[in-house]
Amino acid sequence: MSKEARELKDYYLTKEFEDKYNYEGSLGAKVDERGTVIRLWSPIAESVDLRLYDNGSTGEAETIIPMKLCDKGVWEYSVNENLSGKYYDFALKIKGKVRISTDPYAKACGVNGKRSMIIDLNTTNPNGWEEDKAPLKGAEDIIYELHVKEFSYDENAGFPENVRGKYKAFTVDNTTLRNEGKLPTGLNYIKELGVSHIQLLPVYDFASVDEAGGEDGFNWGYDPLNYNVPEGSYASDAARGEVRIREFKEMIQAIHNKGLRVIMDVVYNHTFSLDNALQNSMPYYHYRLDAKGELSDGSACGNDIASEMPMTEKYIIDSVLYWCEEYHIDGFRFDLMGLLTVDLMNKVQKALDETYGRGEKLIYGEPWTAAKTHMEKGAKGAVKDNVKLLDENIGIFSDDIRDSIKGHVFYEEVAGFVNGNLKQTDKIEEGLTSFGLSPNHIISYVSCHDNHTLWDKLTITTGDEAERRKQNKLSAAIYMSCQGRVFIYSGEEYLRTKNGEHNTFNMPIGLNKMDWELTEKNKDMVSFYKELIGLRKEMTGLCDKSKTAKDNITTFVKEEGLLGVKVANKETSLVKPVYKEALIIFNANKEEKTITLPEGKYKLLINTVKKNNERDDILVSDKIKINGITALFLGKM
């Protein structure tokens, strides 16, 4: 198998193959008033039969139709009939053997993605869909990472039983904790927090949850099956292919109506297994192989997508553009972006910019891999070392600021700046100005769905709860003061815990769900995050994404565990700053420190550790005392 696979790959890499078979046209099934057209790219197939079904998962094919081979290795079937609602797959004869495949370009499918579905997408649009559009961009991109099922599964969140864990939950307005009408939950809570974007963990069709199973099934969803179809387990009916599409659109519409944008987490670096449409229709074209013909495994998931191959590159770009066009998606978070090529990422950004305007769609990802990968054609991966080769608007998660703040994510006992490792002071200073990179390149964060929650990490390194609370506030104050875009993991603001588990991708929903009662228990922390987010949006010196943004920040005091910077805030088209100059001071020492301030009078804006009965309108000059494990924000009068 390995030798045969390598021989196939080498053939695909020849100039002869590329010149003869690289194809730029549309693929998949399309239905309009003229009829139905289905196209599949498979240059090595000897024959292809289209098999049509009435059912999405059971029963024999009602019709089997030989497809016509056209130019560029494209197989086509067209008919002057609207076949919307029919399910289908392909029987391909390759090297004398018949392979059954769904459609790589499927836009709908049956339960568990076993069969593709022909669909007239216009029939899936909710009322008002044509008028749906992204809200205007604000002063800062502040991203809130969220899992569809976790969002609404808690019975105390106030959602009706029939929508808990579903797309439909996002359409339920004015939910409150325990239905008491007091503390908001759901989208109203997120809107009040002050963020600008919701990033949804994978919502394409993934293979790790049985869509025909019970409601307890849970997975993060990093197991792609059908890249261009919404996941069915979040729909009210996974068996009817049109339902998940309509309900997904209703979710997007509801989020937009709240003034929030939507970012989609996409996993174009690997698939759940090789039993999928990409492999079955075109063996080993879309996957990386080493010199011996073995599958490359830089994803630690058993396979790596070969994004350097021209038709794979086309597939990914087509997919991204499709989600924007059909579902009004506002941006993409690329999982293990380091496994994708620099060329691909720049082409994705270019395609989005040309279609929607420069920077309108937000693009960022993880600039690392899980292991070494085998790229062909001299391709370069979109890893951290190659960030300067990426389009300026493509962001990367800053593991440097993350680990400097709280400690290493893989060595749980290793502390960061806030929990005792004062040697990280220089790193914190560098992080405030994006480590010398354009701020557009940096996603500033301290926690996400991966690894321990912030609260759980601090619990490992610090025994005293009161001290942990100070550390949590200081952590948030630091990463929200860094130039770049801000990223918050859902629940971080209410001290979300997963009971010390660091990898809950397939653990019970009871552990993973958002615990909405913690918003009441820790409402002081939620209020602090709101205040911090609000101040961030007013500080144009931090929101600045220009190449000269670093000039807005100057250090006025630095010693081990102590850092004070001055921020220059200029008026922009969106914000007229109340304070044209502000001071931010971090003290990670346990002891109180006295600091000499730059000349002038300052109003205390935020003190993460207030003394009893301390007023909010304190004016200071000359010197100020800062408590241990504290951040101060001051505005110059």
Show where each model-derived region lies.
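C-terminal beta-strand-rich structural cap/linker in extracellular carbohydrate-active enzymes
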Residues: S42, G85-Y88, D617-M637
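Glycine-rich phosphate/pyrophosphate-binding loop
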Residues: A108-N156, I396-A466
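Substrate-binding/active-site clefts of carbohydrate-active enzymes
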Residues: K149-Y327, M337-Y356, L362
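The feature marks proteins involved in alpha-glucan
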Residues: M1-E33, E62, L69-V172
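Active-site-proximal helices and loops of the catalytic beta/alpha 8
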Residues: G59, I64-I65, L69, E215, ...
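Structural beta-strand segments of beta-rich domains
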Residues: R34-I38
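Loop/helix patches that line or flank the sugar-binding groove of alpha-linked glycan CAZymes
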Residues: L437-Y602
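Conserved, mostly hydrophobic/aromatic
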Residues: L40, F90, L146, I190, ...
